[in-house]
């Protein structure tokens, strides 16, 4: 069969026209070394800081060090299969995590991948883990409370929506217990919770999840877990991932609460990554930007105004403010709050709840030191009735601590001093509260009202908690209407106060405690 040249050229033209070749422009480089979860890559010319880098076996890394002739990246996950000479490619994307309501009730890792065995997550979208915090104009003042359900916190160191309140103390002082109680108390309030576990034992995280499920709190909670067995890079990014998940709710005009448990271990993980990347060490071998590590994270917790929410939702949500409240946890060594990381976080946050080993061992739990604990903005957000009644409690405790030290040396005390000491002992006893038993506003108001007005002055110290429980039960059964009025109004007017006084006096006469 003879083909003339024109037919051959037509066939070639047709083949070229129908060719379905697609070209993709990507920067790729060669892995020069892999050590301790750090890869050095040569040849990535246009890589961004924080960009995801694709490596063999569907493994990703994050570019952190951009040097003259190489890139230093941390590997997210296992790296045993990666070897020198492998190809690494730029993705053009900053690290993102899934966000949305589909994450509620789930346990995920630092990348938002499910680790609870309940199948895939139906996420609304993905958002970068590093985001700029809202500006000054986009914020709104903190004026709504986050009820933790703990008498000692809500009365003395109140937390507002959009606040950053540090929980600080030595190991085994009940820091996590305070945070978990706060999460459990958000049930039914519409506040979504995110619990970020950094560098903890997997068994501890499993216990927390089980307790949240038992108390029906897992329905409004996302757990982000980077356990002690996870790579340092995963522990470093976990708080940022959790923060992004919380910001999703803040930016659609809802309220969220995030617990970072704990940022000391995140700082350790970041120090490890930085030293492996050969960054110059500073104080306590931390890198120079360890303050920025925590400040850029905690500044993202804020109360934002309605204009900001409307702009971000494209007008879909109008007239609603959003908030992200942060409860970072810091572990101290032998009560040393002047160490590098504790001082950094104290200066960034809007107050701190200081937990003491001595108080914990003395059976005062939660072991809150009323003198060192402070809330810089929460007072404006406190429920009116608790604010009205809580001031006396704080004063009684402060005077008691001062007088107790003085009374050790004084042989005979005048009547006024003795009364203050007795009141202080009772208030200290009253601030004790069992774990997983948060109180409502009305229950708290009743307790504070009784102690402020001297109804507990004749009760023996060891019977104070029994008196409180009996009083609560009496009011619930006989005067539920008064309790409902306080709960709904959040205030104590003259008429309600008279009714409450009469009810408490009636209870005292029964003597059933």
Curated annotation (Swiss-Prot):
One Gene Ontology MF term: ATP binding
InterPro entries associated with the record: ATP_synth_asu-like_sf, ATP_synth_asu_C, ATP_synth_asu_C_sf, ATP_synth_F1_a_nt-bd_dom, ATP_synth_F1_asu, ATPase_a/bsu_AS, ATPase_F1/V1/A1_a/bsu_N, ATPase_F1/V1/A1_a/bsu_N_sf
Cell location: Cell inner membrane
Pfam families given in the database record: ATP-synt_ab, ATP-synt_ab_C, ATP-synt_ab_N
Superkingdom, natural source: Bacteria
Binding site for ATP: 169-176
Any one GO cellular component localisation term in the record: plasma membrane
Summary of the function given for this chain in its UniProt record: Produces ATP from ADP in the presence of a proton gradient across the membrane. The alpha chain is a regulatory subunit.
UniProt-recorded name of the protein: ATP synthase subunit alpha
């Amino acid at each position: 069969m003879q083909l003339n040249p024109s037919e051959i050229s037509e066939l070639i033209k047709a083949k070229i026209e129908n060719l379905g070749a697609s070209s993709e422009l990507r920067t790729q480089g060669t892995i020069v070394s892999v050590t301790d979860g750090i890869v050095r890559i040569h040849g990535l010319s246009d890589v961004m800081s924080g960009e995801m880098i694709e490596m063999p076996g569907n493994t990703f890394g994050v570019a952190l060090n951009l040097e003259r002739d190489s890139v230093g990246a941390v590997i997210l996950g296992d790296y045993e299969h990666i070897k020198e000479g492998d190809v690494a490619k730029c993705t053009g994307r900053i690290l993102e995590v899934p966000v949305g309501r589909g994450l509620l009730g789930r346990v995920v890792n630092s990348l938002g991948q499910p680790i609870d065995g309940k199948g895939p997550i139906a996420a609304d979208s993905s958002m970068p883990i590093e985001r700029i915090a809202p500006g000054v104009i986009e914020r709104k003042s903190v004026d709504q409370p986050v009820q933790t359900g703990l008498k000692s916190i809500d009365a003395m160191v109140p937390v507002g929506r959009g606040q950053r309140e540090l929980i600080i103390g030595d190991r085994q002082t009940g820091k996590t217990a305070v945070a978990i109680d706060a999460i459990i108390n958000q049930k039914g309030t519409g506040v979504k919770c995110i619990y970020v576990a950094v560098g903890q034992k997997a068994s501890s995280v499993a216990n927390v999840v089980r307790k949240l499920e038992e108390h029906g709190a897992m329905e409004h909670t996302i757990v982000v877990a980077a356990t002690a067995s996870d790579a340092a890079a995963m522990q470093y990014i976990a708080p940022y991932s959790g923060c992004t998940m919380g910001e999703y709710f803040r930016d659609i005009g809802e309220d969220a609460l995030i617990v970072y448990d704990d940022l000391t271990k995140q700082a350790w993980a970041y120090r490890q990554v930085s030293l492996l990347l050969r960054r110059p060490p500073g104080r306590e071998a931390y890198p120079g930007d360890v303050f920025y590590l925590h400040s850029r994270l905690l500044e993202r917790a804020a109360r934002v105004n309605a204009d900001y929410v409307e702009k971000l939702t494209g007008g879909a949500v109008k007239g609603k403010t959003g908030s992200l409240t942060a409860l970072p946890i810091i572990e101290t060594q032998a009560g040393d709050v002047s160490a590098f990381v504790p001082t950094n976080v104290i200066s960034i946050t809007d107050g701190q709840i200081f937990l003491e080993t001595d108080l914990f061992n003395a059976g005062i739990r939660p072991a809150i030191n009323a003198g060192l604990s402070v809330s810089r903005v929460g007072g404006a957000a406190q429920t009116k009735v608790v604010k009205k009644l809580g001031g006396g409690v704080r004063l009684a405790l402060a005077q008691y601590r001062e007088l107790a030290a003085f009374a050790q040396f004084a042989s005979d005390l005048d009547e006024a001093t003795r009364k203050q000491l007795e009141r202080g002992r009772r208030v200290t006893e009253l601030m004790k509260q069992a774990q997983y038993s948060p109180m409502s506003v009305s229950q708290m108001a009743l307790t504070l009202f009784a102690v402020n007005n001297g109804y507990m002055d004749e009760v023996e110290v060891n019977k104070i908690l029994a008196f409180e429980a009996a009083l609560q039960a009496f009011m619930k059964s006989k005067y539920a209407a008064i309790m409902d009025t306080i709960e709904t109004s959040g205030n104590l007017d003259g008429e309600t106060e008279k009714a409450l006084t009469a009810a408490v006096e009636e209870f005292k006469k029964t003597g059933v405690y």
